[in-house]
UniProtKB/Swiss-Prot annotation:
One of its GO terms (cellular component) is mitochondrion. Belongs to the AIM23 family. Disulfide bonds: none annotated. It is found in: Mitochondrion. It holds the Pfam family mIF3. This is Altered inheritance of mitochondria protein 23, mitochondrial.
Length: 347
């Protein structure tokens, strides 16, 4: 608009130049007319390119576009980026997918990782944890979330898994995203011959109840044996962690979750429940890299655990699994025989 306005003025003045020059020749007004003629013959020329360039050179323009104020200091929003030195493009994509989930939960990258030497959970940072990961051999997985930390801080529980398992987890995640997109578009998944994981019958999960009041001995022996045996068989398990007297095995809905947030427990009870959760995570993380958790520690928690894939290329693992099942059948048969002998002797 400014360009057209200037051009119009210049055209108007162009036809008036002759008259103005005659006016300027007048001796009386010679001094005054020189200023007018200088103004007319030195009008600035409008250059769109120069105008745009000068407009973008403002030192303060968009200065705070990617900043936020913190007191008197400006801080840039930083995004953690890890450069991998190993693995294929797909292996790196799978690891980056898990990394995004971790940072979404804890933006500083603080995690809890399983120490391979002690088999215990220890606090660490994802930057240091990833330095020792060779993606050609192992991938990473977020097996659970530690909600017991003080305040609003949540620590993802991370472990290394075989690269084959990491790639399967990534593939399952992409499939689930695709199915959700199809559902939003109104596509019936049943017609495509596929079914959402959430639509599977509850009977596909083995329900195991765990009490907050369970003793350390029962947790390490009886309950640990029950959990491990099911995972080794390839069964998916759902751990219902609740009070001893509760028999609630129903899913947790939004209303119940809101009610949980309003309840509270003592510090002593909170500490005990944290110990139970930590020991359960130590047990299941060795056999699974797909763990979902819902609920709150002050009421009840449901942990759904999908076992890792059995390496079919390893004959030793298949043989060991067969031997274990054989021993279980023999032990079961022996118990039946002893029970029958006891009943016969009493008669």
């Amino acid at each position: 608009m400014k360009y057209h306005y200037i051009q119009m003025l210049r055209t108007t003045f162009k036809y008036s130049i002759s008259s103005i020059r005659l006016f300027c020749n007048n001796r009386v007004l010679q001094n005054e007319s020189r200023a007018v003629s200088d103004l007319l013959f030195n009008l600035p020329t409008y250059n769109p390119a120069t105008h745009r360039k000068s407009g973008n050179n403002s030192p303060h323009k968009n200065r705070d576009k990617h900043r936020h104020r913190n007191g008197n200091k400006d801080q840039r929003n930083k995004k953690l980026v890890f450069r991998w030195n190993s693995g294929t493009e797909k292996q790196q994509a799978a690891a980056n997918s898990v990394l995004e989930e971790i940072l979404a939960i804890n933006s500083k990258g603080n995690i809890k990782a399983i120490n391979p030497e002690t088999s215990k959970l220890e606090e660490a940072n994802i930057r240091n944890f990833l330095k020792g990961v060779n993606l050609e051999i192992n991938g990473i997985a977020m097996v659970s979330i530690d909600n017991a930390a003080s305040g609003d801080v949540r620590l993802p529980i991370v472990k290394e898994v075989p690269t084959r398992q990491a790639l399967k987890n990534y593939s399952d995640k992409l499939s689930k995203i695709k199915e959700e997109e199809l559902i939003k578009l109104g596509v019936n998944i049943k017609k495509t011959g596929r079914r959402s994981p959430d639509s599977k019958a509850d009977s596909s999960w083995k329900s195991i109840k765990v009490s907050w009041q369970i003793s350390d001995y029962d947790l390490k022996k009886q309950k640990c044996s029950e959990i491990v045996s099911n995972l080794e068989k390839g069964s998916k398990i759902a751990l219902f962690i609740n009070d001893k007297d509760s028999s609630n095995l129903s899913p947790i809905d939004e209303e119940e979750l809101e009610a949980m947030q309003e309840s509270s427990i003592s510090k002593k009870e909170m500490k005990r429940r944290e110990e139970v959760l930590e020991k359960l995570n130590e047990i299941i993380s060795e056999y699974s890299s797909q763990i979902t958790q819902e609920g709150l520690i002050n009421q009840r928690i449901i942990m759904k655990v999908t076992p890792n894939l059995v390496n079919t290329n390893n004959g030793v693992d298949k043989k060991a699994l067969k031997e274990q099942r054989k021993r279980e059948r023999q032990e079961k048969l022996q118990r039946r025989i002893e029970k029958k002998k006891t009943s016969d002797s009493t008669e």
